[in-house]
């Protein structure tokens, strides 16, 4: 692996956080509360926890830097749109297709980051991207190939927008990572998402007559602590050490690890498709970690990278 200890730290932080994110489905499965209610509680609690454990002073200091406040606001609003459109896609499409469209964000990042961030697309990124995205397709193939697959134009539009806004979130977070800590991004993000989602969350919770039971508390706490406060802060901070294209590929360890947590905590046996897809995603992540270039700001395009890969093969 090229690069120094900081680069290794970045891969460890992003990869470790992605593994933690893989348990999100377990926490969500513990509660019957409306998604908007869970989101607002989760993000508000996560922001409060990070602020309480030392992030508040950094947030106040760093958010006042020139140009940072606007980007923090944009980051939070992108997260709101991404989360909302993903849930809309889940409502109008089968789960497999909604997840597939959302996880297309690494492709969008590979296409635009050379032009927006001046980050060269390496040949190894092209290979790793093909492996990782193929892994997602293989994992979801039983649902995607189902003749009864549920389709709708609004659902497809929401799914594509979810993937695009997730890519935009990564790109904006990358521009912020040189100026602020992961805790600052997490606090701002949590507050913005909670404020926007709270009215809808309260309306759906009160209107549906949902009781708030102990399992709901543990679910929200688990999501807030592991999937957001801890995992989110570490992930966002780790982005500063590695190229954003690498971040999006290593981040796909999340769906690869989700079946492991489902097996351990819910006794759900993974299928052969799931295991094969997870292996492909892992192979893609390992490629960028071991063979990714250390330079973070060279210019280049995916087309040039493909040409390099063909020339060296």
Language model region names:
Residues 1-40, 77, 85, 148-175, ...:
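Glycine-/small-residue-enriched transmembrane alpha-helix faces in small-molecule transporters
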Residues 59-60, 289-303:
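Membrane-interface capping segments at transmembrane-helix boundaries
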């Amino acid at each position: 692996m090229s690069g120094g200890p900081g680069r290794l730290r970045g891969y460890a932080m992003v990869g470790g956080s992605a593994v933690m994110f893989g348990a999100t489905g377990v926490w969500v499965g513990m509660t019957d509360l409306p998604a908007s209610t869970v989101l607002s509680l989760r993000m508000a609690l996560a922001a409060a926890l990070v602020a309480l454990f030392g992030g508040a002073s950094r947030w106040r200091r760093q958010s006042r830097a020139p140009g940072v406040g606007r980007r923090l606001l944009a980051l939070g609003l992108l997260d709101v749109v991404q989360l909302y459109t993903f849930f809309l896609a889940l409502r109008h499409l089968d789960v497999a297709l909604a997840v597939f469209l959302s996880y297309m964000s690494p492709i969008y990042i590979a296409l635009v980051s050379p032009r927006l961030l001046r980050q060269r697309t390496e040949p190894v990124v092209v290979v790793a991207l093909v492996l990782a995205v193929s892994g997602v397709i293989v994992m979801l193939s039983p649902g995607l190939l189902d003749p009864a697959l549920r389709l709708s134009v609004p659902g497809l539009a929401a799914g594509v927008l979810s993937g695009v806004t997730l890519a935009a979130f990564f790109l904006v977070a990358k521009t912020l990572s040189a100026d602020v800590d992961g805790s600052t991004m997490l606090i701002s993000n949590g507050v913005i998402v909670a404020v926007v989602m709270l009215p809808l969350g309260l309306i759906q919770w009160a209107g549906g007559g949902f009781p708030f039971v102990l399992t709901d508390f543990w679910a929200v706490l688990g999501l807030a602590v592991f999937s957001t406060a801890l995992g989110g802060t570490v992930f966002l901070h780790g982005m500063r050490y590695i190229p954003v294209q690498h971040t999006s590929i290593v981040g796909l360890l999340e769906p690869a690890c989700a079946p492991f947590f489902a097996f351990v905590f819910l006794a759900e046996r993974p299928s052969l498709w799931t295991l094969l897809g997870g292996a492909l995603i892992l192979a893609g992540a390992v490629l960028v970690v071991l063979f990714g270039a250390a330079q973070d700001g060279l210019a280049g395009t995916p087309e040039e990278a493909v040409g390099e890969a063909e020339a060296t093969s």
